[in-house]
Amino acid sequence: MLLVIDVGNTNTVMGVFDDQRVVCDWRIRTERETTEDEFFVLASQLFAGKDIKPEIITATIVSCVVPPMRKILHAFCKKYLGHEPIWVSAEMDMGMPILYDNPAEVGADRIVNAVAAYERYHDALIVIDFGTATTFDCISKDGEYLGGAISPGVGIASEALFARASKLPRVEIFNPPAQAIGKDTAKSMQSGIILGYAGLVDGLVRRIVKEMENKPRVIATGGLAPLMANVAETIEEVESGLTLEGLRIIFDRVSNS
């Protein structure tokens, strides 16, 4: 079986594939100060909950945007799984040209999402990933990674507001307001955070569309994708398992090359 790991700044998502079928997946907090032994203890508990024995995992592929986690996961794989992990990078031959001025700058998670999305749709695309940062990644109709945009995530933006505006309360950001005009402070903040962020998404997507040769399909992934798809006018599809599927696709391509 194949273990796929996507390490983000806030959360780490893991999944186990049996051929092309995802058997199970988990979302855990990214702990930069952990050790390979502590990671194994946590992973073992997750595996046991799904009756997965570590010895049946024969390969691991990782996308990671948190440099300290590379050493930890490399040691975990070697010590407890008996193999070295494959690390996703722009230098790999994944069947997708990276048309960035410096391809090495492209985050592994952005590449993974782009590969998975194009494999699924085979069309011009904008992939929006709502994570710690919100990334907009553009793929041409011919399957080229064109570049994109990066903005602060919804969580970062709201936390900055809570921290810097001492008289404003901390509000729930996972429930969109019924209207833009808030009738109290909490609803006004929800409007500004959620509907305001939807405006950011729609405005940026419309600008990007004007620069692309073919009209793209707009898809969203990440933890807040379902919420934002309900309030942003330009999002057409939500693909919650995009990153894990992309890791599986890249592993297959690299293994068969």
From Swiss-Prot:
Binding site for ATP: D6, V7, G8, N9, T10, N11, T12, V13, T132
SUPFAM superfamilies cross-referenced by the UniProt entry: Actin-like ATPase domain
GO function term, MF aspect, one: ATP binding
Gene Ontology cellular-component terms listed: cytoplasm
Residues bound to K(+): D129
The protein's Enzyme Commission number: 2.7.1.33
Chain positions recorded as substrate binding sites: Y100, G107, A108, D109, R110, T185
Pfam families noted in UniProt: Pan_kinase
Top-level EC class as recorded in UniProt: transferase
Keyword Repeat: no
Subcellular location: Cytoplasm
Assembly and oligomerization: Homodimer.
Family as reported in the entry's similarity comment: Belongs to the type III pantothenate kinase family.
Protein known as: Type III pantothenate kinase
Organism encoding this protein: Desulfatibacillum aliphaticivorans
